[in-house]
């Protein structure tokens, strides 16, 4: 097996959308029912994707809103971003658009690995954002999209596998696009 690769992933989104629950479900395989607002946590996990082992460092950020100032650390050595909203919250869906814009401004790249996640899909009766709305937003960003339920452990692993694939796809395109110069 090839040597493991290290990847750092930031999880961003409005408060109470389930960023920590999704991350803990992936890392520890459990759902945390209580809610304590996150300041910032970092988790690590080994995962194998397509035969390649990855050592993931997951930065579970504090909830952002439209007025939040992004710390510069969210742009340094980050290989991919998971942007999370709740399918039960119009506000979180609107704020994720603002977060995406700020992220692009901060990182300064046209193409960055982004995974848009509509969380809390198990709350059918409270849903206000359709699957189609989430998918359309992700497509407008040229980003991957999944809906998830951290509580029911639906697609938590898929979310993190997918962001790795997105990061590798963009890394591969960037390395192929590099030009070389020869002096003779």
Curated annotation (Swiss-Prot):
Tell me the residues on which Cysteine methyl ester occurs: 181
Q: Where is the lipid attached (S-farnesyl cysteine)?
A: 181
How is this protein organized at the quaternary level? Answer: Associates with the mTORC1 complex (MTOR, MLST8 and RPTOR) in a guanyl nucleotide-independent manner. Interacts with TSC2. Interacts with MCRS1; the interaction maintains RHEB at the lysosome in its active GTP-bound form and prevents its interaction with the mTORC1 complex inhibitor TSC2, ensuring activation of the mTORC1 complex by RHEB. Interacts (when prenylated) with PDE6D; this promotes release from membranes.
Report which reactions are catalysed by this protein: GTP + H2O = GDP + phosphate + H(+)
The record's annotation in PROSITE patterns points to: RAS
Q: Which Gene3D superfamilies match?
A: P-loop containing nucleotide triphosphate hydrolases
What does its activity-regulation comment describe? Alternates between an inactive form bound to GDP and an active form bound to GTP. Inactivated by the TSC-TBC complex via the GTPase activating protein (GAP) domain of TSC2. Autoinhibited by Tyr-35, which constrains the active site conformation, restricting the access of the catalytic Asp-65 to the nucleotide-binding pocket.
This chain belongs to which protein, by name? GTP-binding protein Rheb
| Organism annotation | Rattus norvegicus
| Residues with Phosphoserine modification | 130
* Record: residues binding GTP: 16, 18-21, 32, 35, 38, 119, 122, 150
Q: Which residues bind Mg(2+)?
A: 20, 38
Chain sites annotated for binding GDP: 16-17, 19-21, 38, 122, 150
Lipid bilayer topology: Lipid-anchor
Posttranslational modification: Farnesylation is important for efficiently activating mTORC1-mediated signaling.
What does the record say about tissue specificity?
Expressed at high levels in normal adult cortex as well as a number of peripheral tissues, including lung and intestine.
Q: Where is this cross-link: Glycyl lysine isopeptide (Lys-Gly) (interchain with G-Cter in ubiquitin)?
A: 8
* Chain span(s) of sequence motif Effector region: 35-43
């Amino acid at each position: 097996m090839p040597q493991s690769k290290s990847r750092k992933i930031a999880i961003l989104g409005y408060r109470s959308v389930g960023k920590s629950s999704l991350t803990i479900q992936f890392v520890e395989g459990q759902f945390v029912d209580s809610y304590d607002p996150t300041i910032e946590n970092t988790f690590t996990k080994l995962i194998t994707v397509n035969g390649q082992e990855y050592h993931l460092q997951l930065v579970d950020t504090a909830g952002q809103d439209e007025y939040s100032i992004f710390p510069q650390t969210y742009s340094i050595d980050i290989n991919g971003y998971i942007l999370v909203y709740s399918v039960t919250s119009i506000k979180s869906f609107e704020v994720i658009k603002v977060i995406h814009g700020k992220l692009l401004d901060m990182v300064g790249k046209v193409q960055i690995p982004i995974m848009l996640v509509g969380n809390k899909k198990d709350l059918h009766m409270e849903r206000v954002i359709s699957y189609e709305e989430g998918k359309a937003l992700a497509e407008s960003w040229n980003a991957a999209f999944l809906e998830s339920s951290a509580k029911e452990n639906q697609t938590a692993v898929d979310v993190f596998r997918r962001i790795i694939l997105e990061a590798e796809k963009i890394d591969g395109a960037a390395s192929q696009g590099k030009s070389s110069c020869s002096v003779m």
